[in-house]
Amino acid sequence: MQTYGNPNPTYGWWAGNAGTTNRSGKFLAAHIAHTGLMAFWAGSFTLFELSRYDPSVPMGHQPLVALPHLATLGIGVGDGGVITDTYPIVVTAVLHLVLSMVYAAGGLMHSLLFNGDIGEMGVKWARKFDFKWDDPDKLTFILGHHLFLLGLGNVQFVEWAKYYGLYDNAEGVVRTVVPNLNIGMVWNAQFNFLAINSLEDVMGGHAFLALFMMSGGLWHIVTKQAGEYTTFKGKGILSAEAQLSWALAGVGWMALVAAFWCASNTTIYPDTFFGEVLDLKFSISPYWVDTANLPEGTYTSRAWLTNIHYYLGFFYIQGHLWHALRALGFDFKRVSNAIGNADSATITLN
């Protein structure tokens, strides 16, 4: 974290990231525990939604988020997008709950039992992942593993679609999908991705994304910093604060893209599960409203999912700017001090 030259900074209880700044083992523990929280939410909320699901009301007109996403994967639904078998849904939920306990145990072990620094652990291969925030070689090595695993996730998604199928909103059935591997399609879609209306194109995009991510991951794993470590590559600003700012920028950008996609695209977000497409309105800030006739005080899943993605993305970007400026050395306390001293300031005209 930015210390502005103070060798012994202190942080408030709310600055949780500060406790993991120079302790790679604690940083890993926080990541594992966070994964456990996400898995617990996914499993528990799926069971909660399943207990409240009303088959007489369209899924998209109910306050659901987990069930619609499972339904798009063809889990538990049949023709017409109706839930026909709750067993695979329950299995998915329970699996997430079991994994959340495993992650929680891992987080606690790394936080309480294992060494606070990975470099001091007794396992040789684990020490390879020890890092310092200003060490580009170690950071690019770890980045490579992240990219490679994300690529494997894309491969898994493509293979699921090929062998188990996805829900096709145009046909109203769950069907297998063979990816369209035309690179021209992928290139053109980046300029008009909101209009994609083919599951084959969607899976083709994920297949190419898997290739790019895994190739980039291998590059970062087997190579060190190419060329001299210059300011352009982060020398002087490569820090925990800078890394946090870039992470917030990435998450914020993905949230904004998801908001626009969810608002208008019925291939990826079928109206059977998420409700009708939305209208974009403007007030103090942009917002989306339902086009369906719904009872007073009720909204489609698409409406609140779109709006919450947009506003979370907006504030993530603000967080990115805040931490990026701090990483560059800007001290926001100077702003508050300047405002506080405005009354006593004097202005001279020469």
Swiss-Prot record:
Protein name per Swiss-Prot or TrEMBL: Divinyl chlorophyll a/b light-harvesting protein PcbB
Transmembrane helix in keyword set: yes
Record text on subunit structure and interactions: The antenna complex consists of divinyl chlorophylls (a and b) and divinyl chlorophyll a/b binding proteins. Under iron-starvation forms a complex with PSI, consisting of a PSI trimer surrounded by a ring composed of 18 PcbB subunits.
General function of this protein: The antenna complex functions as a light receptor, it captures and delivers excitation energy to photosystems I. The Prochlorales pcb genes are not related to higher plant LHCs.
Topology of the protein relative to the lipid bilayer: Multi-pass membrane protein
Keyword Thylakoid: yes
CC cofactor: divinyl chlorophyll a; divinyl chlorophyll b
Organism, as annotated: Prochlorococcus marinus (strain MIT 9313)
One term of GO molecular function: chlorophyll binding
Disulphide connectivity of cysteines: none
BP-aspect Gene Ontology terms: photosynthetic electron transport chain
Keywords (A to Z) from UniProt: Chlorophyll, Chromophore, Membrane, Photosynthesis, Photosystem I, Thylakoid, Transmembrane, Transmembrane helix
One CC-aspect GO term: plasma membrane-derived thylakoid membrane
Induction: By iron starvation.
Cellular compartment(s): Cellular thylakoid membrane
InterPro entries from the UniProt entry: PS_antenna-like, PS_II_antenna-like_sf
Parts of the chain that traverse the membrane: 27-47, 89-109, 141-161, 202-222, 244-264, 305-325
Similarity field: Belongs to the PsbB/PsbC family. IsiA/Pcb subfamily.
